Amino acid sequence: EIRLSLVGSEMCIRDSNQIEKKKSEQAALVYKEWLEEISQENPNNENLNNLLDKFLNDYKNTGYTQLALLSKANFDANSNNYMDSLDNFKKLIEITNGFNGNRIYNKIARVSASRLLLSMEKHDEALEMIDLYSSSDTNGYIHELTGDILLEQGKIDLAISQYEKAANKYTDESSQTIVAMKISNIDM
């Protein structure tokens, strides 16, 4: 009886792996279409949105969907469609969150969304977007972005503190110089 259940479990796992492999192959074909469209000199936004919907509806848990969301969010931002860009970054955050998520894409999406929210003067939302990273010992860029948001909120001392943390984290001279300029501009 135990043997029978083990054999059954093994068959389910094998079938599940075959289904996932087939789904990944299908997603790869859709991604090929995606690349062809987004690589055009003037990509058709409606086609991109239709392909993105297909990814989200049929292949949500694949890396192809994450790549498509990231490239569409960047495309929208470059086309001055900031709300669409923000929406796609938020979708990317949602599917890359959690234990089995993709931390790198999640961080990229959060930082990019935060920058967009800052430009829209939605300072509290911008801070919330990166709070996961700014409250921990993180890289210089997150501290600098946090400083930018706090400065816009008029929280001068907190902004300077974040800029100083950023300067200490940066290893390249140009980033350190930029942060130093931001601090000196505050003091003026």
Name these PLM-found stretches.
Residues 1-8, 12-13:
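Single conserved hydrophobic/aromatic residue that forms the stacking wall/gate
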Residues 70-137, 141:
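Alpha-helical adaptor scaffolds
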Residues 42-91:
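Extracytoplasmic/periplasmic/luminal assembly and interaction segments
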Residues 125-188:
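Extracytoplasmic/periplasmic C-terminal soluble domains
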